């Protein structure tokens, strides 16, 4: 059975990575936000009241990646070498992909997950006025399927 690395009989700790070699690390995470088809069309046409939804979501996602160790208590601050956030449109969804790269001693999965999550939350925030129903609820809107689709540790 695998053991937890951040918790032992003495309590909680940040894992020691000083002995590890710095190698290329990459992680890719994906997730989707379900939206009304009319909202998707507004975003594509650039006609949302709050501005450019996609550019704002990209910026938010990149910022989230950079802030990961401040928000997840036991994550190491990692010198990132690159972050890419992209989007693919479906009829009733937007799929976000966040790729994070670093040359360091520990992986960047949490950073990729944070980036995709905040990008999707930002989309929701920017379109909530048109997604609400008459009672102010969101019967169609949901974020789903956030997961790591690729993790790379280049052995050298």
UniProtKB/Swiss-Prot annotation:
Source taxonomy: Archaea, Methanobacteriati, Methanobacteriota, Thermococci, Thermococcales
Protein EC: 4.6.1.17
This protein's pathway: Cofactor biosynthesis; molybdopterin biosynthesis
SUPFAM superfamilies attached to this UniProt entry: Molybdenum cofactor biosynthesis protein C, MoaC (SSF55040)
SUBUNIT field: Homohexamer; trimer of dimers.
Protein name: Probable cyclic pyranopterin monophosphate synthase
Species this protein is from: Thermococcus onnurineus (strain NA1)
UniProtKB keywords: Lyase, Molybdenum cofactor biosynthesis
Sequence similarity: Belongs to the MoaC family.
Described function: Catalyzes the conversion of (8S)-3',8-cyclo-7,8-dihydroguanosine 5'-triphosphate to cyclic pyranopterin monophosphate (cPMP).
Gene this chain is encoded by: moaC
Top-level taxon of origin: Archaea
GO MF terms held by the record: cyclic pyranopterin monophosphate synthase activity
Enzyme class: lyase
Active-site residues, as the UniProt record annotates them: 125
Catalytic activity: (8S)-3',8-cyclo-7,8-dihydroguanosine 5'-triphosphate = cyclic pyranopterin phosphate + diphosphate
Amino-acid positions noted as binding substrate in the UniProt annotation, renumbered to this chain: 74-76, 110-111
